[in-house]
Curated annotation (Swiss-Prot):
GO terms for cellular component: bacterial-type flagellum basal body, rod. Structural component of flagellum, the bacterial motility apparatus. Part of the rod structure of flagellar basal body. The keyword Cytoplasm does not apply. This is Flagellar basal body rod protein FlgB. Belongs to the flagella basal body rod proteins family. PROSITE patterns: FLAGELLA_BB_ROD. It comes from the Bacteria.
Length: 128
């Protein structure tokens, strides 16, 4: 028998990661005028794979390198700007706003899918 968490699938993990990404993006936007501030983000796909247990790399030969670096540890990465600012700030407002809007839309979609999944489970529990 599978647990309740297993029934929610990847949607619950996606929701948490979307919230984390949203916090990073809003921090970037809030610090757009802060000198030497470095814009940060996460690799959502890699983080979701890691959170769902699919993120471990399989080594098929002894000479393979182990995965490493900030992305492998689940840390926020620094974003490289297309056109860097003279004050050292790497926030590009248009990029941040676009990423924020897309992430918000995907957050709402994940929430709707999770709500539907929970409604389906409640219907099954009630026997309707």
């Amino acid at each position: 028998m599978t647990g309740f968490r297993d029934q929610l699938g990847v949607h619950a993990q996606a929701l948490v990661l979307r919230e984390t990404r949203n916090n990073l993006l809003t921090s970037n936007i809030a610090n757009a005028a802060t000198p030497h501030y470095k814009a940060r983000d996460i690799d959502f796909g890699a983080e979701l794979a890691r959170a769902s247990g699919n993120g471990t790399l399989r080594t098929t030969e002894a000479r393979h390198f182990a995965a490493g670096g900030p992305a492998a540890r689940g840390e926020a990465l620094y974003r490289d700007p297309v056109s860097p600012s003279l004050d050292g700030n790497t926030v590009e407002m248009a990029v941040e706003q676009m990423e924020f809007a897309e992430n918000t839309l995907r957050y709402q979609t994940s929430l709707a899918l999770l709500n539907r999944r929970i409604s389906g489970l409640m219907t099954a529990i009630k026997g309707e």
